[in-house]
């Protein structure tokens, strides 16, 4: 919990799997951050300047911005419900991705490989 921010840097993959309640947001500056729980990234906005991989089901409410890309993996159905402005595109590599708003998939291309 708390008001701090989580920052992911470095080329490696970091997986967050627990439910977290921090509110200061998440910054992904390098590598890949995998969220395997819709509550893994707390309640703040996500600045994705690398790769955010969502390997989970449920509804992801956090706003996603930045120049990075979003990958939906795993077999579950995930709904993006935030007003997202990320520009790096969206890749669906597994499961189903539902956009509940026009802005949910950011402004980049969408590639469906599922």
Region locations from a protein language model:
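Surface-exposed loop/turn positions within long extracellular repeat scaffolds
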Residues: 1-2, 13-67, 79-114
């Amino acid at each position: 919990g708390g008001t701090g921010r989580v920052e992911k840097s470095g080329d490696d993959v970091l997986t967050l799997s627990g439910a977290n309640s921090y509110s200061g947001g998440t910054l992904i500056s390098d590598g890949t951050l995998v969220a395997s729980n819709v509550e893994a990234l707390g309640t703040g906005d996500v600045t994705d300047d690398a790769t955010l991989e969502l390997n989970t089901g449920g509804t992801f409410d956090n706003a996603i911005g930045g120049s990075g890309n979003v990958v939906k993996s795993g077999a579950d159905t995930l709904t993006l419900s935030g007003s997202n402005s990320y520009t790096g595109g969206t890749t669906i590599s597994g499961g189903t991705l539902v956009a509940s708003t026009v802005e949910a998939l950011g402004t980049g291309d969408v590639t469906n490989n599922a």
